[in-house]
Amino acid sequence: MNVPKYDAIFMIGPQGSGKGTQGKRLAEKLGYFYWEMGGILREEAKKSTPFGIKVKNLIDAGKLLEDEELFRVLQTELPEVIKHKRILFDGVPRTVPQGVHLIHYLQQNGFKDFGAIHIDVPKEESVKRLLERAHHEFRTDDTPEKIGFRLDLYESETKPVLKFLAGMGDLYTIDGVGSIEEIENRIDSVLNI
């Protein structure tokens, strides 16, 4: 198996695209450290700290953290994360300022080669998957109204990140409709693994 040249890979896609599932599988296959922003924030939301309460309220409302607040999380987490020389980031960056901040930090710490995998899924498919997830897992951010709001945020704030990431390294857009295995095979194919 060929291992990609990337020091960091970013999994980008709307909620319900399967980026978490595919990111975990890819990280395990390649020996990358898997780091998921959503999981970090859900853990933070369980804490009774002022920041934890704020994060919980934002998650419950289906909203995203402001960039400055996310930078605070990154500054806390990244010194430990970058000890791993190959990292797969899931769920970050979600805005161009987050991308600039994260890439700059990584470059300052010796990371040079970046790849991004954009899992492209139609809005209707994302909604269907998220409603199904809400039925099986209790997620306060998976109601129809909050799903619609988050997918609109993805279109307005996260999609522009794709152009930024393409300028920083390689960007691969993958059709995210199909079985887990079909999507995994598409990713493997574009990465030549």
Language-model regions, residue ranges each:
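Glycine-rich phosphate-binding loop of ATP-dependent small-molecule kinases
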Residues: 1-193
